[in-house]
Regions:
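Amphipathic, Lys/Arg-enriched alpha-helical "gate/interface" segment within cytosolic domains
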Residues: 1-101
Length: 101
C-alpha cells in the first residue's frame, strides 16, 4: 500500500513532482488503503484536498462497483464531474481524461 493516510499521500505527491516534474498522477486503487473508501473516516477528503491545493490532477483507477454506499457513489460522481480528481475504470481512460484537463 502506497497511500494509507494524509502524510503518505503528501509524501508520494511531492516525491512524484520533485522527481518527474509531473502534475498529473494515476494510481491504482489497490495502492490506497481501504479506509480511504469509507467516507466516514474523512481520509479521502483530506487527501484529495492536498492534491487540489498543490494543483496536482489525480486519477484513481480500478473497479469501484463494490462500494455500495450511496454517499461513496455520489462522491465519485461529483469528483468525475470536476477537473482535478477522477475515479476511472482503467489507465487508458485516466490518461485520456488527464490529458484534457
Amino acid at each position: 500500500m502506497l497511500i494509507s493516510d494524509v502524510q503518505s499521500a503528501l509524501d508520494f505527491m511531492v516525491t512524484v513532482q520533485y522527481k518527474t516534474g509531473c502534475n498529473r498522477i494515476i494510481l491504482n486503487k489497490s495502492a490506497i488503503g481501504e479506509e480511504f473508501f469509507h467516507l466516514s473516516t474523512k481520509i479521502a477528503g483530506e487527501i484529495l484536498q492536498k492534491f487540489v491545493n498543490y494543483r496536482v490532477k489525480f486519477a484513481v483507477v480500478g473497479d469501484f462497483s463494490s462500494y455500495a454506499s450511496e454517499s461513496m457513489k455520489a462522491f465519485i460522481l461529483e469528483c468525475n464531474r470536476g477537473k482535478d480528481i477522477f475515479f476511472l475504470p482503467d489507465e487508458e481512460k485516466a490518461v485520456e481524461k488527464l490529458s484534457t484537463v
